[in-house]
Amino acid sequence: MSGIFIAIILLTILALLFGILLGFAAEKFKVEGDPLVDQLEALLPQTQCGQCGYPGCRPYAEAIANGEKINLCPPGGSATMEKLAEMAGVEPEPLSATEEVQVKKVAYIREEECIGCTKCIQACPVDAILGSGKLMHTVITDYCTGCDLCVAPCPVDCIDMLPVEQTVKNWDWKLNAIPVKTLDEDCQC
């Protein structure tokens, strides 16, 4: 019985020593990231669609910090591009020519043709497609960014990209362009 307690105590001491060693190494060899890259990445839509020519939003944020164009993110639209311009300290540019003419589109699945293969669900970077294996799928249009990544994997071509009508609910009001003054808590107004 005492052999088990000795083994437990030795393993506990060994675990504590390794924990201290790993904690020290983590602090000693810590790699600081660029705070500008973190801020730029937070502004991007995080769809990881690759339409900008980079494999994800983080590499595109790093490229912007190194001087790349800020108008390459179609899912983000002009609002994201304007915020990126402000953060990067450059002039806003119009979005790429193809995006400037296009209207916002969302995916639409013709459910009567859907075979339930789940390939579109796996391709969607924002989980905007609802469904399960061998059952029809549908798109949650409020979540769809229009990145078009779900269309190509569909084996029966039952996914279309349809333009979104401008309504009061989805109109771009640009409310964050209105300056707002915040009051301090100790202000007696």
From Swiss-Prot:
Intrachain disulfide bonds: none
Domain 4Fe-4S: 32-90
Primary location: membrane
Record domain 4Fe-4S ferredoxin-type: where: 105-134, 135-164
Residues reported in the UniProt entry to bind [4Fe-4S] cluster 3: 124, 144, 147, 150
GO CC, one annotated term: plasma membrane
Pfam families: Fer4_21, FeS
Biological role: Part of a membrane-bound complex that couples electron transfer with translocation of ions across the membrane.
Domain of life: Bacteria
Localization terms from the record: Cell inner membrane
Organism, as annotated: Shewanella sediminis (strain HAW-EB3)
One BP annotation, GO: electron transport chain
Residues binding [4Fe-4S] cluster 2, per UniProt: 114, 117, 120, 154
Protein name: Ion-translocating oxidoreductase complex subunit B
Oligomeric and partner information: The complex is composed of six subunits: RnfA, RnfB, RnfC, RnfD, RnfE and RnfG.
Record-level Gene Ontology MF annotations: 4 iron, 4 sulfur cluster binding; electron transfer activity; metal ion binding
Keywords: 4Fe-4S, Cell inner membrane, Cell membrane, Electron transport, Iron, Iron-sulfur, Membrane, Metal-binding, Repeat, Translocase, Transport
Gene this chain is encoded by: rnfB
Enzyme Commission numbers on file: 7.-.-.-
